[in-house]
Amino acid sequence: MDVLANPGPLKDIVLYDQEKHVSSAVWDGQERGALRCHEHTSKLGEWKLKPKQIELVERAGFGFLRRIPAISLDNPLISALVERWRRETNTFHFTVGEMTVTLEDIALLLGLGIDGKPVIGLTYTTCSAVCERYLGKSPASNSASGGMVKLSWLKDNFSECPDDASFEEVERRTRAYLLYLVGSTIFSTTTGNKVPVMYLPLFEDFDDAGTFAWGAAALAFLYRALGNASVKSQSTICGCLTLLQCWSYYHLNIGRPKLNREPIHDQFPFVLKWKGKQNGPTANRDVVFYRKALDVMKPTDVVWLPYENMNGGDMSDRMRKSLLLGRSKTMLISFDKAERHLPDRCRKQFDLFQDIPADVQRWVRKSRGVDGGVDLSNKMESELSEWEMRWENIVPDDVQGVDEADYMRWYLGITRKIVGRPISLSSEFQRTISNVRDILELAENFQIHDLDLERGNMISRIIGLAQDCLRDQVGVTATPETQQQIELGKRMRGKERVRRKGMGKRRKGIDPMEDYGGSEDESQFGPLVEVGQMHLPLSHTNSVYDGTHMYDAVTKVDDMELCDTIPQLPETQDIHKIEGSLLDDTDKFVEESKLQEEFDGEEPTESYDVKKEDKESKVEDDDAAKGFSDVSGEENANREEEDETEMGESVAESSSLDRRGENTVVA
């Protein structure tokens, strides 16, 4: 079936919540843009921990997480990944099959424990009592909300431990740091600046805190956040987004930045590979860009085993042995959140052949919020039982007779093949033309007076390229010149206002602000003059600094064009620019008279002495003062008598013709 008619799923046996999913809204043209990503790591470095505190943090199981610096988030990339996340399976549905963030990923990337007691306990409706007990002080009413406390209150009151602090005070300040750490990273909420105090009792004994499966809890929290954000009505996402982004960097060749340095492959945890400044054009990439990339992703864009050459020398033996839990079909628990971990749907991430996975059992997600005031252990008995059986539910090794072609045929029937509706080539072309018009308008309105010569010429080059792109477009409205460009590049000629169009057409009574359209001539390089037996197109360029019009002869044979010859000029004469391919009848008569005078050996009616710099300078100064020159016929005649010249002006000097009010001069 045509993917445009039905992008999937063709059968709703797996993705039964398609109508609620953001991909349905995107297909219908309802763009929500990039998600607001809530992760609060920017001020973690302001905590000044003493050696005793660092020791307690490591005993609690957060020694590696503490070392991870703030990593700039790519919100559009994260948003595009969310569009591929399905909460029915807790996996990404890509073109190559399903993938997910596993327990193995979180252990290797963050260095958090994935085996141990589930992170669950009491929830609280107020902060005062629990903060007083574990921190030694309680927040004011403006620093707390229900069972949550502001991160800023924790930092302001506990970020620096006095040198002479008692051991009890050191423990209290360390608990405050741990609460801030988890609330800023693995358990960040959409509130943006608060963390639940229900984690504090788990830090009462630091050695006991190290026996919890914090990595499994962090993954449950992220799964829930991804599922919530995939609903089309949502606009925010929380959880450990550094984990999600770095997982994508390792597994997908989409949005991956280039490192400014050679990575340290064995630095553990592996998320440290992406710390520091990075290169790459990600700044200008939006959700649509990443969505298109994911829609056409190929198998070669996927790295199924990104850690196989990384040994993680600092990893403990306990953690190394627990990596097998990455293949465990189990339930992940984080207080009020329980999420299924289904690695059997992503066997290729463990170097196994992918067969058709078992049906996903539908389950009702339990969530009582953080203000329930109850012990959740009594509310999640079945989920806790599954976690207890985690080592008995390891996905087996390869079985005989697995055909991945059968899997892909099945998968394409149950998945959402693409998220973005394909755009026709004509629509893409029109969008490009519209963008070029915008670029041209911006360039023409750019304030170039304060720029140096190089940058000014660069702006001129941009204008020329944009005009060249728009030249042959039907219905393209010519872009008006700005007053700034008129002052720099155009001059009035007598009582005549001139507009160049095509190959230099002259028309009277044209406003100097009138549009400059593209050339009607097929030549791409401007007027043609004969040199010997070859006709060289002259490339027309405006100088934005002195108002001259420069013509550069194209010298490459491949760029030359054939044309009808113009009258043969004497070889002893230099070639001046020919301006105006289409003349009014009166103008044509004047031009023919000038040509005839020249061929008869007479001095041209109008000529200039290139050595009379003082006279030119005076005229230029007058022009600059007026903005446009008004030169009467009598003044022209006086100049003709004064200027006895030999022909042979250079191309750059021909620009003075414009400033003196001349029409067309042929030497």
Swiss-Prot record:
Biased composition (Basic and acidic residues): 608-618, 656-667
Compartments (UniProt record): Nucleus
Residue list for modification N-acetylmethionine: M1
UniProt-annotated stretches for the region Disordered: 492-523, 594-667
Gene Ontology molecular function terms on file: transaminase activity
UniProt-listed Pfam families: PMD
Keywords for this protein: Acetylation, Aminotransferase, Nucleus, Transferase
Claim: Acetylation is one of the keywords in the record: yes
GO biological process: meristem maintenance
Protein name: Protein MAIN-LIKE 2
Species this protein is from: Arabidopsis thaliana (Mouse-ear cress)
